[in-house]
Regions:
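Active-site region of chymotrypsin-like
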Residues: 3-19, 46-105, 149-154
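Beta-strand/loop subdomains of soluble extracytoplasmic proteins
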Residues: 28-34, 38, 43-57, 66, ...
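PDZ/PDZ-like domain segments forming the peptide/carboxylate-binding groove
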Residues: 16-21, 71-76, 80-81, 133-175, ...
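PDZ-domain C-terminal substructure recognizer with occasional recognition of PDZ-binding tails
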Residues: 116-128, 141, 159, 168, ...
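Conserved active-site neighborhood of the chymotrypsin/trypsin-like protease fold
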Residues: 1-42, 76, 181-184, 201, ...
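C-terminal cap/linker of serine protease catalytic domains
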Residues: 89-146, 211
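Active-site-proximal beta-strands of protease catalytic cores
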Residues: 26-39, 70, 79-100, 108, ...
Length: 212
């Protein structure tokens, strides 16, 4: 890589930005992908292969992501980007979510879920933080275990706003500031409407024996 400060204006004007693909809609198993950057553990390396999975969910704090896995062999410490055959970025390489038996296969976090975060970082926008990891409630859980529709809390960050507010692991978020929450996406969108320091009302349903 070369610092932009070392490039003259003519060279800079000839450069073009990489377009971002919609990784949620355009990626499917079998698609050809290219790993660029440092996939092999040393600078300016490249890898070529196909996507093997596009539906693995990563449950992060306050936001979920999609893990794109490939059959490209690389380094356990790889980094860089994953592009499709049209040259559009579909993901950022991240090996930390790989299973031990797949530690040298290149994986990436889908770019679509990262776009808003990248925009916020570029514009120095502070993101609200509640401190919960959530997942969608499956139809089977609703049918057989009477779990209500909403964002099911699978983990809580220590000393977070959620923990201090009395929210527990196993609770289901069903509304935020009066807006109904039926999924992880609803939760993320509603939280994104808030600003750091805002006081919000969170409606939860808590398990009590065999009901909520």
């Amino acid at each position: 890589t070369i610092p932009l400060t070392q490039l003259n204006d003519t060279t800079k004007s000839a450069l073009s930005y990489a377009a971002l693909a919609n990784s949620q809609l355009s990626c499917k198993p079998g698609d050809i992908v290219i790993a660029l950057g440092d996939p092999l553990g040393y600078g300016s390396s490249i890898g070529y292969g196909i996507l093997t999975s596009t539906t693995t969910e990563i449950n992060g704090i306050d936001h979920n992501y999609t893990l794109l896995t490939t059959d490209i062999y690389g380094s356990a410490n790889a980094n860089g980007i994953l592009i499709n055959k049209n040259g559009k970025v579909v993901g950022l390489i991240n090996q930390s979510f790989n299973k031990p038996e797949h530690k040298t296969l290149i994986s990436a976090v889908g770019i679509t879920e990262l776009t808003k975060l990248i925009e916020n970082l570029c514009n120095d926008v502070k993101r609200p933080h509640m401190g919960v990891s959530v997942t969608n409630v499956s139809s089977l859980a609703m049918r057989y275990y009477n779990v209500p529709m909403g964002a099911y809390i699978i983990d809580i960050e220590m000393d977070s706003a959620a923990m201090k507010g009395g929210i527990h692991k196993g609770d289901v978020i069903t509304a935020m500031n009066g807006a109904v929450v039926t999924s992880v996406l609803d939760y993320e969108l509603d939280l994104g409407e808030c600003a750091p320091g805002d006081e919000i009302t969170v409606t939860i349903m808590r398990p009590n024996d065999d009901t909520y």
